[in-house]
Amino acid sequence: MASNQSIRQRILSELGSSGLNRFPPQVLELAFRRVEREYAGQITESTNREKSVCRRRATGKRGQFHFFLRHYFGHYFGSPFGPQQKALIEDIQALRGRQRDPVKMTRALSRGFGKSTVLTLCGTLWLILTRTWNFPIIISSSLESAKGFLQAIIDECEDNAVLLEHYPELRPKKDQKGQTVSWKDGDIVFQGGARILAKGFLNSIRGKRRKESRPDA
């Protein structure tokens, strides 16, 4: 978004300072403020429209995981997806809307093809935002490894400005006093109500719940 200073500089460059010298400073200030308000309104309207369109294309009723990856996580995917990645993306897309049907899925990808990024990071967030998952658990060979995967999710939810602007429900939840609840390295709860746990292969997950919700993935 352009700053007020840059807006004024643009007006001056287009109109020329010589033509403005005949107006009192107070009149110019009022004129500048009016233009700034109108410009800010246009920017806000354009931003809201973009947000609505992107949310619909990514996580709406017919939202596509492929668009979600490209639009919000383009910094991970600089090249076109290969056949193995496309197959995994299609698998994740197919999980949507299958909350009631238990699903077991196995998909092998070559090393370095982004298994963890596509599924554990982006796939987990997309399935939460589409309300397919509400309480997933990330299980890895060790607790530290699982925490590393969860930390990647935390990093994106803290630093990915476009993702946060379009999905504020991915911010940390607030307590009854309205204060932000700090995330733990193995357990995070979002404003939207979803929760993610990180566990090692030998750690017990029995009895885990969030209010009335038990782990669903």
What are these regions (language model features)?
Residues 1-113, 117-217:
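Short, flexible loop motifs at catalytic/binding sites
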